[in-house]
Amino acid sequence: QEAEYSGVTMAEGLGRTVLHRSRFARIWGLGNRSAPVAQTPCLISASNDPEELLSIAPFRSSQTRTIPAKLTIDTVHCLTPPNFDVPGPVFEASIGHVLPPSLDEANAGESADSGSVLPLSWQRLHHDASLLVENLKPHIVVLVDAVQLAAQSGKLVQAIHVIKNKFPGALLWTPGLGGPDNAAVLAWFGVDIFDFSRAGFAVASGHLLTAFGPRVPLDGEECSSSVAVTHYDQSLRSVRSAIASGTLRTLAEQQSLNSPKLVEHMRFFDKLVNKSNNVMRIHPLGVDRIDYLSTTSHQDSSVEQWVDFISNQYQVPEKLDNVLVLLPCSARKPYRLSKSHRKFIQALGTNACHEVMVTSPLGLVPRDLEDVWPAAFYDIPVTGDWSRDELHRIKSMVCNLVDRHNYERIINHSGMDLEIEGFDVIDTRQGERSGSRNALKRLTDAVQTAKEELR
């Protein structure tokens, strides 16, 4: 469905093309795909916003004071296909009656419009059957009660997740919620359009809203709308750069530390995405490394789904489930290209053993899967120390792997203490370095003995 929205094939509406993607985040090129005039994540201005913002925001918004209110979104750019020769498009929609999200069992009555701009609220997502129509393809979705949802546990990410799955090709705006201090987090969830409301309120109260959170200006530092716009613009530029380079998750984790609420949103989002089954299907285009630098990143859905797959679905290649050899990981990927693993392979002297690398946060990486995403692309800080959670995860995965296969011998060269019921695990390290001469000789001897005894 996303492809149906993209590019310049539409006869009307908003021309846009996906330039980069990172999970739910997108950089959309706005206008003619051969020469986009703007990119998302971007700003949307209101009539009372500072001039500096009006000059860099590709969208403008206005809202009537009627009940229900009418929302208008337009642009000074020529974004309407196929010719892209006149300013536009101009979208209008009634917001309808919006009740507080806490009244999720209530029906607001008069619903909002359904068209090129689609205003949504928590109630509408629960009660409006017209949203199920297959040919409903909005250009912009506006989550009108985003601020209220952010104050209620888990509801914001639930609403965004539903919207991004139902309307993947629509731009998403969460009015009043975005700012330079949370742009990376919201973009990671899938938000595309940001307004100046919070940044403006901060300036009015004598504070600057920056990518690192709100702060009081330093002595001699100007606290003005112009400075606030600069901080906002730089924050969105950093977000776009992170999407393009595949590092948005890392930036979002850093920015989530600006407030407890952002950490809460990240955790709820991870739990929600972990329930889906499509995260590991696609290697993000242009991404040659994924960083798992913090304990928070260990809860990312790419990790959780890998752990679940290895623990419950992975099947050892035929005739290899006889001797299990546990090996340490290496910084270089794929592992076999590293100096240490070349030594291990030489010491083993056979490909008849099932080689499995012990690592964090993925837990276990079988040799036959070392070239796939994310196993071949992750990077972690290496200290040689294991946390309690890491030890529990790895030991649990080893036990699950052993329970589902017919191993007769387990050789442990990983350096981790492992006890597995029903097995006398052979420790070939015995406290020495994995690449030491004695440890490698013990590895060779253990494999040779297993081959002779298990013929």
PLM features: residue spans?
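Short acidic, S/G/P-rich loop/turn micro-motifs used as interaction or catalytic elements
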Residues: 48-52, 63-64, 83, 102-104, ...
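Glycine-rich phosphate/ribose-binding loops and adjacent secondary-structure elements
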Residues: 97-223
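Terminal amphipathic helices with adjacent charged low-complexity linkers/tails
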Residues: 252-275
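Positively charged, amphipathic N-terminal segments that serve as targeting/anchoring signals
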Residues: 274-406, 414-415, 435-453
